[in-house]
Amino acid sequence: MAAPRDNVTLLFKLYCLAVMTLMAAVYTIALRYTRTSDKELYFSTTAVCITEVIKLLLSVGILAKETGSLGRFKASLRENVLGSPKELLKLSVPSLVYAVQNNMAFLALSNLDAAVYQVTYQLKIPCTALCTVLMLNRTLSKLQWVSVFMLCAGVTLVQWKPAQATKVVVEQNPLLGFGAIAIAVLCSGFAGVYFEKVLKSSDTSLWVRNIQMYLSGIIVTLAGVYLSDGAEIKEKGFFYGYTYYVWFVIFLASVGGLYTSVVVKYTDNIMKGFSAAAAIVLSTIASVMLFGLQITLTFALGTLLVCVSIYLYGLPRQDTTSIQQGETASKERVIGV
């Protein structure tokens, strides 16, 4: 049977590419704006928690549509959620790691420009590659390893003399921001590969697994809210500092990942590479216009290296990842969750 991406038009693929690119770029810019605004600053831990709740509701809705009837939907929830405490415990691992990752993203964008963040965050590619080799016993081609080192060199150039934003009035700590990204990419690589391994361990639906993970995620993020900002939230309120822009960021975070996990089956690695590179370019342009970002030579060269390495990493390859045909669909399902 032909793969889904073989049956769609170029126009639809370009649509998928455009939406993925815009979501990645707009989310980063919008989040950066909400963290550097001169208005009352909201609690990022509450935003992460609400995002998990919305993802859970969306996944429940998609599962209901997938099962086709109320009876089968209830049976699926009863069997896979209420009757599977071990599976919930298993999915609590990526839930915890993703919660840390999402909170680190807020911390990073509070201290780094959106363009610098977008470029540096691409370190998730070598991190994921390393986790894939160690946890799933796959291999990478020589070209992929070259692209990994090229990407690391590009990020080093970007961080060597970071581009500065002249219109941002809040106090920033670039070193703290880079540390937050480092933690985020480690979390992204491990959690993504771990979740893929869980998906491949059974024939359980992706949306059931999402529900299991988001249920655990809500508990984990609520604990984070209490431990990190509990006293201030009790004084100021859970939704303190929320604006339309904050809700927009939450919407993008909730819908963006789920949308990407659905449309990625219609694209390929080259298109995803172009999408990531285009998102970097858009974020840079927006940062120059909105935040007064001053581009340095090292930033420009580093960004170019990162974009080229992303493209090279996604080039078609033969027998480089040791993934059988039956495993490919599972890999497609997990990207972007």
From Swiss-Prot:
Residues 1-9, 65-87, 136-141, 197-209, 263-269, 316-337 are cytoplasmic. GO terms for biological process: carbohydrate metabolic process; CMP-N-acetylneuraminate biosynthetic process; CMP-N-acetylneuraminate transmembrane transport; N-acetylneuraminate metabolic process; protein modification process. Residues 31-45, 109-114, 161-175, 229-243, 289-296 are lumenal. One of its GO terms (cellular component) is plasma membrane. It catalyses: CMP-N-acetyl-beta-neuraminate(in) + CMP(out) = CMP-N-acetyl-beta-neuraminate(out) + CMP(in); CMP-N-acetyl-beta-neuraminate(in) + AMP(out) = CMP-N-acetyl-beta-neuraminate(out) + AMP(in); CDP-L-ribitol(in) + CDP(out) = CDP-L-ribitol(out) + CDP(in); UMP(out) + CMP-N-acetyl-beta-neuraminate(in) = UMP(in) + CMP-N-acetyl-beta-neuraminate(out). InterPro entries: Nuc_sug_transpt. Its main location: Golgi. GO terms for molecular function: antiporter activity; CMP-N-acetylneuraminate transmembrane transporter activity. It is a multi-pass membrane protein. The keyword Membrane applies. Keywords: Antiport, Congenital disorder of glycosylation, Disease variant, Golgi apparatus, Membrane, Sugar transport, Transmembrane, Transmembrane helix, Transport. The chain crosses the membrane at residues 10-30, 46-64, 88-108, 115-135, 142-160, 176-196, 210-228, 244-262, 270-288, 297-315. It is found in: Golgi apparatus membrane; Golgi apparatus. CMP-N-acetyl-beta-neuraminate binds at residues 55, 101-102, 117-124, 188, 210-214, 272. Residues 316-337 are annotated as: Disordered. Transports CMP-sialic acid from the cytosol into the Golgi apparatus, functioning as an antiporter that exchanges CMP-sialic acid for CMP. Binds both CMP-sialic acid and free CMP, but has higher affinity for free CMP. Also able to exchange CMP-sialic acid for AMP and UMP. Also mediates the transport of CDP-ribitol. Belongs to the nucleotide-sugar transporter family. SLC35A subfamily. NCBIfam families: nst. Monomer. It is linked to Congenital disorder of glycosylation 2F: CDGs are a family of severe inherited diseases caused by a defect in protein N-glycosylation. They are characterized by under-glycosylated serum proteins. These multisystem disorders present with a wide variety of clinical features, such as disorders of the nervous system development, psychomotor retardation, dysmorphic features, hypotonia, coagulation disorders, and immunodeficiency. The broad spectrum of features reflects the critical role of N-glycoproteins during embryonic development, differentiation, and maintenance of cell functions. This is CMP-sialic acid transporter. The gene is SLC35A1.
